[in-house]
UniProtKB/Swiss-Prot annotation:
Signal peptide: none annotated. It comes from Xanthomonas oryzae pv. oryzae (strain KACC10331 / KXO85). It is an enzyme of class 6 (ligase). The lineage of its organism: Bacteria, Pseudomonadati, Pseudomonadota, Gammaproteobacteria, Lysobacterales. GO terms for cellular component: cytosol. Consists of three domains: the N-terminal catalytic domain, the editing domain and the C-terminal anticodon-binding domain. This is Proline--tRNA ligase. It catalyses: tRNA(Pro) + L-proline + ATP = L-prolyl-tRNA(Pro) + AMP + diphosphate. Keywords: Aminoacyl-tRNA synthetase, ATP-binding, Cytoplasm, Ligase, Nucleotide-binding, Protein biosynthesis.
Length: 564
């Protein structure tokens, strides 16, 4: 490949609307160009990277025993009505009509199409298990597309759907796909974590996300120093608290005239923030609920919504709070409520003795409060808080927090989609059985942006070698003035390619500084310079993308540096 015959268009300017490093560098490197909000054209350069990711994903899916298919991107409303997702998916589902006024959607995911295909193709347990995958463009009508291809409306995704007779078989394929994903992200050269996760709108019984670790990540992750435990903070749990100590103080009311937060109350009383309790008032279909967490903790909305009876809860308004507790927000607590209320206590709150709560009296709190003496034992005890950096994990290690970019997700869906679309088989006993499904997604275009977020410096991208558009670029100094240099560079290029390296020749005739800056911006792992001076000395100038300086090497030394 000669770059003089390749479309390569880099820029020095940083676009004003590009917030993330990956967005800025992809635009500057000429990998993508914006067509409309959330819609991007992938240039020849960008497509080379995209195809390399795609190739590794395809190889590992094939290795894992999945078989490739291609579902339509446009899908009929009837399928989505059957699963209830025509309405449930919300505004992200792009809905269209054809000339006959029949309704369709541009699929953001393909559970319905996969289940319908399985219904048509699979009729006996003897055909199971089967795992179908595709690599296809998807569309989600994001309200505010941003961050370039990180949160675009149109994106390239690998999605797979497996079908099984039993839950045990579904679980085996789930583990098989988790192993395949681990191989994929390892081969791509990414620092990643597989974390326990909430199933969200897809649904299902078990779920795990794969995150690329990056400071700019939108998701908070927790992982233990004691094992491979890792989880999204939506689901992460710490070790169980120590057993509750015996009460040692009498309950009494103290004045806190302007102290409405746990931090202010703790400072006024001169006590540890951990001894205070935060009361969060919410409304459910069944009525008013008071959720309690320690003052140094924060309520986890996902966990709280999973407490029986709290699905779909909302924060209570001031009128509702006054009606049930008899006071204004800022002084709320579970003692002496105006009406009977349900109390949901976090595990750490249930383990407290001699704690501090709002008195349900304006300008006052209660100190020395104890369960079973001053108020009944909590009706419900559950883990409803976010974990905190440095606390003890269940495995005995310490929890560490990091930011991550989700690039893959695996689900055990169970039978919900197959049941809705009547995807059944005849089992060993001759009876009709609804198939079990698994679902496994990888954001291929998102991986490209995530890799840049994790691997860059002030000069540009630093690609992991498997993702780089070329592993090596041979740079020619003054190609138009010295045919001998060009000939030597071409000969070197041919040898590199013969040695199994993906290499290109930069014969564009740019000034050396501009050419080298481009190579750094593009993230080329290895740069080799062929010049008249070098040829006279029998050497090539070599520099790895992450090296501080270049070095002069003979051909044997060069190939050794390149691992050949």
């Amino acid at each position: 490949m000669r770059l003089s015959q390749f479309h390569l268009h880099t820029t020095k300017e940083t676009p004003a609307d590009a917030e993330l490093v990956s967005h800025r560098l992809m635009l500057r490197a000429g990998m993508i160009r914006k067509l409309a909000s959330g819609l991007y054209t992938w240039s020849p350069l960008g497509l080379r990277v995209l195809r390399k990711v795609e190739a590794i994903v395809r190889e590992e899916m094939d290795r894992a025993g999945a078989v490739e298919v291609l579902f339509p991107t446009i899908q009929p409303r009837e399928l989505w009505d059957a699963t209830g997702r025509w309405e449930k998916f919300g505004g992200q589902l792009l809905k269209i009509k054809d000339r006959k006024e029949q309704e369709f959607c541009y699929s953001p995911t393909a559970e319905e199409a996969a289940a319908e295909f399985a219904r048509q193709e699979i009729n006996s347990y003897k055909q199971l298990p089967l795992n179908f995958y595709q690599i296809q463009t998807k569309f989600r009508d994001e309200i505010r597309p941003r961050f370039g291809v990180m949160r675009a409306r149109e994106f390239l995704m690998k999605d797979a759907y497996s079908f099984h007779l039993t839950d045990a078989d579904m679980a085996r394929e789930y583990d098989n796909m988790r192993a395949a994903y681990t191989r994929i992200f390892t081969r791509l050269g990414l620092d990643f974590r597989a974390v326990q996760a909430d199933s969200g709108a897809i649904g299902g019984d078990a779920s795990q996300e794969f995150h690329v670790i990056a400071d700019s990540g939108e998701d908070s992750l927790a992982f233990s120093t004691g094992s491979d435990y890792a989880a999204n903070v939506e689901t992460a749990s710490a070790a169980l608290p120590a057993p509750r100590a015996a009460a040692s103080e009498a309950m009494q009311q103290v004045a806190t005239p302007t102290q409405k937060t746990c931090e202010d109350v703790a400072q006024l009383l001169g006590i540890a923030l951990q001894r205070t309790v935060k009361s969060v008032a919410v409304m459910t279909e069944a009525g008013f609920v008071l959720a309690l967490v320690r003052g140094d903790h924060a309520v986890n909305e996902i966990k709280l919504a999973k407490v029986p009876g709290l699905a779909g809860y909302r924060l209570a308004n001031e009128t509702e709070i006054r009606a049930h507790l008899g006071c204004e927000p800022g002084f709320l607590g579970p003692v002496n409520t105006a009406r009977p209320v349900r109390v949901v206590a976090d595990r750490d709150v249930a383990a407290l003795a001699d704690f501090v709560v709002g008195a349900n009296v304006s300008g006052a709190h209660l100190v020395g409060v104890n369960w079973g003496r001053d108020l009944p034992e909590p009706e419900t005890v559950a883990d409803v808080r976010n974990v905190v950096e440095g606390e003890r994990a269940a495995d005995g290690g310490e929890l560490r927090l990091a930011r991550g970019i989700e690039v893959g997700h695996v689900f055990q869906l169970g039978s919900q989609y197959a049941q809705a679309l009547q995807a059944t088989v005849i089992d060993e006993g001759g009876k009709v059985a609804v198939m079990k499904m698994g679902c496994y997604g990888i954001g291929i275009s998102r991986i490209v942006a995530a890799a840049i977020e994790q691997n860059h410096d002030d000069a540009g991208i630093i690609w992991p070698a498997p993702m780089a558009p070329w592993q090596v670029v041979v740079c020619v100094i003054n190609p138009k003035q010295d045919a001998q240099v060009v000939s030597a560079a071409q000969a070197l290029l041919d040898e590199l390619i013969a040695a199994g390296l993906d290499a290109a020749l930069d014969d564009r005739g740019l000034r050396p500084g501009a050419m080298f800056a481009d190579m750094e911006l593009l993230g080329i792992p290895h740069r080799v310079v062929v010049s008249e001076r070098g040829l006279a000395a029998g050497t090539f100038e070599y520099r790895a993308r992450t090296a501080a300086a270049a070095e002069n090497l003979d051909k044997a030394g060069l190939f050794s540096r390149l691992g050949r």
